[in-house]
């Protein structure tokens, strides 16, 4: 069962408490491609053996799959470059995905004891609310924590019906794709998905990042037959809109991934441990 938070706490947790509550439920995703290249993203354990991430983390374009998907836990690799710590990759397969919503559900072996992240009712989130993100930004530390606030609430982003997102200033970068956007109670209010880096005339844009709302994720999971417990009420105008017809199930494996564009990471709360992606990929081996 996937648990949703239904009540707000009287006093919110500190960023440190939110991080400690959820860091073991956030995974590193490494995709291996037939041409030998690799790429990375972030995911969240939301149920026994199930991880949610972005479709673009495990797809090239809209429907081409990588040759292999490996999942790593913080307990395996936490900011340690020693070769031995990078031999614990858990094989994952895609159960379903939706390229328009930019969501993908993975099934992963041997993570049944990993705690699941709770999903909040995103209808209760308001502009100005503080939020946090955990992920693996390029050139930053693995399992990094960044902070910000909700800047705007957007429905039907890019004209895609049912794709309701939060705009946030929370610092994100390549590698944060698919990771959780967390509220002050440590529950997921969104799945970090993309950022704006430059306008059409080339002007630099900073602090404009987006996360698919947790209620969109909840409805999409329900359409796939994933049972939910302690589900918070949801507004009728955000229920099951434009999701079912776009869903893909059990696609054939193909090749590589896409990731977010980068932004300056000026709100890194964890001690920086820079990783060059090429060096990082060379360390990873599956069991």
Model-based region annotation:
Residues 1-5:
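Bacterial N-terminal signal peptides
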Residues 12-19, 66-69, 73-80, 87, ...:
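C-terminal cap/linker of serine protease catalytic domains
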Residues 17-18, 61-62, 93-95, 108-141:
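Active-site substrate-binding loop(s) of clan PA
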Residues 21-36, 108-116, 143-222:
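Active-site region of chymotrypsin-like
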Residues 40, 47-48, 52-100, 111-113:
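Catalytic-histidine neighborhood of serine endopeptidases
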Residues 54-56, 136, 194:
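Short, surface-exposed secondary-structure boundary micro-motifs
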Residues 81-93, 127-132, 143-155:
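Beta-strand/loop subdomains of soluble extracytoplasmic proteins
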């Amino acid at each position: 069962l996937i648990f949703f938070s239904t009540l707000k706490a009287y006093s919110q947790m500190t960023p440190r408490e939110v991080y400690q509550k959820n860091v073991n439920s956030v995974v590193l995703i490494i995709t291996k491609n037939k041409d030998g290249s690799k790429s990375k993203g972030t995911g969240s354990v939301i149920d026994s053996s199930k991880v949610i991430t972005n479709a673009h983390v495990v797809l090239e374009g809209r429907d081409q799959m990588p040759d292999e998907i490996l999942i790593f836990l913080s307990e395996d690799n936490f900011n340690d470059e020693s070769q031995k710590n990078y031999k614990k990759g858990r094989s994952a397969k895609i159960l379903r995905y939706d390229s328009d919503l930019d969501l993908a559900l993975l099934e992963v072996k041997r993570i049944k004891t990993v705690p699941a992240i709770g999903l909040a009712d995103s209808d209760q989130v308001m502009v100005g609310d503080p939020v946090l993100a955990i992920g693996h930004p390029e050139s930053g530390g693995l399992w990094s924590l960044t902070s910000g606030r909700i800047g705007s609430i957007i429905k039907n982003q890019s004209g895609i019906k049912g794709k309701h997102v939060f705009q946030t200033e929370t610092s994100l970068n390549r590698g944060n794709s698919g990771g959780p956007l967390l509220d002050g109670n440590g529950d997921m209010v969104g799945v970090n998905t993309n950022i704006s880096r430059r306008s059409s005339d080339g002007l630099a844009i900073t602090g404009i990042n987006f996360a698919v709302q947790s209620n969109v994720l909840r409805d999409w999971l329900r359409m796939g037959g994933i049972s939910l417990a302690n589900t918070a009420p949801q507004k009728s105008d955000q229920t099951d809109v434009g999701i079912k017809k776009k869903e893909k199930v059990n696609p054939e494996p193909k090749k590589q991934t896409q990731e977010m564009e980068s932004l300056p990471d000026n709100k890194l709360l964890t001690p920086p441990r820079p990783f060059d992606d090429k060096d990082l990929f060379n360390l990873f081996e599956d069991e």
